Amino acid sequence: MPGVRKRGEEIREFILANITDNKNIAALTSQQYAISLPAVYKHIDRLVLENQIIKKDGNFFLQSKQYKYVYDNNKTLSEDVVWEKDIKKHFSGVPKNVWNIWVYGFMEMFNNALEHSKGKKIRVVVEENKLFTCIFISDDGIGIFKNIKLNFNLLDEKDALLELEKGKRTTDTAKHSGQGIFFTSKIFDNFMIFSNGITFDSKPEKKHQINTNAVKFSTLVYMRLEKNSFKKIRDVFDEYSTESPGDFDKTIVPVRMANTNDLVSRSQARRILGGLELFKDVILDFSGIEDIGQAFADEIFRVFPKMYPSTSITAKNANENVQFMINRAINTKL
């Protein structure tokens, strides 16, 4: 019965691949393969017996291993030493492209905690299972969104989410380019930052089951990547380059991150535009935005291009109402 055996293996692989981000994995599998729930649970029971998944509090999870490290945030601590001493051993045998992504992401995020958090402790948790590896980096400092709010004089900590989406925004221009979080968030399969009840999520359309209660923190960074990922750092860098490969001169800004329901004023527009003059190509993503005001549109699509003619600013995913206001602003002759 090779056909039946192959189908069973396919079903179990589906369960393993989707169990982390789906609480009701049985229903999802039943729907995907048009089989009964009892049939699905036979496959789940087999995976439990094989020690590939575990059941906890009524939910199923991939069997995983955790490794925890705690560091004093002092002048002798550095991200490269931590990587060499404790972290890199967890990635022996992974493809070169996966290795490169983890080197880049870990170094950037650990350094961020080291130099920006103003905390006393930095904690790292490496969690790995059959399919992917996760790293959690947490600190007990000021909190990333609060730090950004104070440095950029923002109205609310939630406004910091928009600044992170822009890129080239940093609280320490002398030492940092503002590219670390931006590119790290794009490179990984999943990237999230938790701080003071606020979440920055690089993949908000996906459902995540992440336990943030295991450790007290001011900021917690979560990175996840499949062990056999085909992603390459170069491809992500090139995606945000318009001319020379590797030049970070393009950005895509989701307008929904503006932390307001009514986008009507010039002040709101200026907050979105802050720092975007540093790019050659700016794309504003209007997904989820129902309407915008005349003054808001005019500031972005008429005033800003006159002030910064070397920066191209365009819109995507604009509905009919939004596009009407954009066209009206572009065609205004003064």
Identify what each model region corresponds to:
Residues 279-292:
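Short, glycine-/small-residue-enriched flexible loop/hinge segments at domain edges that mediate gating
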Residues 297-308:
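Short, non-transmembrane amphipathic alpha-helical segments
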Residues 183, 271, 299-300:
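A short acidic, amphipathic alpha-helical/loop segment
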Residues 1-107, 116-121, 230-273, 277-278, ...:
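Bergerat-fold GHKL ATPase/HATPase_c domain
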Residues 142, 289, 318-319:
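Short beta->alpha junction loops/turns
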Residues 268, 296-297:
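Residues at alpha-helix caps and immediate loop-helix transition turns in enzyme cores, especially N-
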Residues 292-295, 324:
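Short active-site-adjacent structural elements
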Residues 54-69, 113-233, 304:
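Conserved beta-strand-loop-beta-strand hairpin that lines the nucleotide-binding pocket
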